[in-house]
Amino acid sequence: MVHYPSDRTRRLSDTIAAIATPPGQGSVGIVRVSGPFCRQIAEQVTGRVPPPRYATFCHFRNRYGEILDQGLILYFPGPHSFTGEDVLELQGHGGPAIMDWLLSSVLQLGVRLARPGEFSERAFLNNKIDLAQAEAIADLIESASEQAARSALRSLHGEFSAQIQTLREQLTELRCVVEANIDFSDEDIDFIERGMVAERLKEIQSTLQSIHRSARQGALLREGVRVVLAGRPNVGKSSLHNRLAGFEAAIVTDVPGTTRDLLRENITIDGLPIHLSDTAGLHNSKDTIEQEGMRRTREELIHADHVLLVADDQSGLTEAEQAILDELPDDVTYTLIFNKIDLSGAPAGRWEELQGIALRLSALTGAGMDLLCQRLKECAGFDRESEGCFSARRRHLEALQRAGAAVVVARKILGDKGAEEILAEELRQAQNALAEITGEYRSDDLLGEIFSTFCIGK
């Protein structure tokens, strides 16, 4: 992997430091230092350079020799460290005052405060990890479920990157064959065994589709699904919200219009993160507060991934529900929920209406909730039993889609006479799209966008 000099790589001459543990009180706090002056920092703060990779007890002192704290110091000489540079960790007591005091003392020794994600960025620039692995670090820290953590670990261990690298090597081999044919076009030599190339392209396309499915599962685990509850007032939206959330997050009364503002909860269903929104009931009202609540409801519907349109089972689907359906954006999926079967006496069930999939349930008793949970996983395309998925982001999915589109074009034009140059270009486009995932083909703007979302000290 080759990275070219930029302002970012030139800043590697700086020594950086940051608190690496979460803010607040704790038994242990860590100040992490990386860069060429780690040995000098160790001597200044503790009076000696500790043996590499051994935890050594010491007193931490400021530049005037005053004791700040006591704890452990660890020294990792580069390149055998996380960042590939000399790294120092000062592990003291985890009070915020102690940590700030210790960090300030280190910064007074000519060290710069690290930017968010700069330690991981240096690991990437020093070829210790690729870009997908760097992103997996942040994903692992932010994991909201066991499944999300497992998928992030697989990416961190390089499983995602290894599959991408294998595909790039296969595309390189095909490009060599195609470009050799272009170079010797005047010598009546045909290097392309079109049957072989066609078969290889078919295999690459199939592998890309498989990787995309796994990556999409990982993206779902990371980003979750935005689900919005909508409907007329007093149809049980808030009761359904509370049932899904597992506690009484929303106030529930018999008075229509009780919910006047958005109420959001983050929940998980079998490991699938769901960002759930309860909204104000949509109806004709002259009340200023209700009108503002309904404006926010409509705005929330525009940004939804899936809408649960709740109706009263005793009333059925009315013109009011149909009007809400007509307002939904074309790319938003929805499920019709006929609630309150505890009053109508109908059994829980699922069927298909002219307008789409419908469920009959009771938010009060919980009857039919298993059908709703299954429906939400189905709409998201989530498979809890899917093994081998890895942490992925929207940019990864977009890159895989672009690579797949280029391979599709390559397969179509393979049999066209004189299309070798276009074929080679499509293969190159597929290669570059895949290289964006691991960072071998990237811009500094992309790096800035990615690493700025990391926590400081990582």
UniProtKB/Swiss-Prot annotation:
Note accompanying the cofactor annotation: Binds 1 potassium ion per subunit.
UniProt entry keywords in alphabetical sequence: Cytoplasm, GTP-binding, Hydrolase, Magnesium, Metal-binding, Nucleotide-binding, Potassium, tRNA processing
First-tier enzyme category under EC: hydrolase
Assigned EC number: 3.6.-.-
Listed PROSITE patterns: G_TRME
Primary location class: cytoplasm
Residues that bind K(+): 234, 253, 255, 258
Cofactor: K(+)
Subcellular localization: Cytoplasm
Alphabetical list of NCBIfam families matching this protein: mnmE_trmE_thdF, PRK05291.1-3, small_GTP
Name assigned to this protein: tRNA modification GTPase MnmE
Lineage of producing organism: Bacteria, Pseudomonadati, Pseudomonadota, Gammaproteobacteria, Chromatiales
Gene assigned in the entry: mnmE
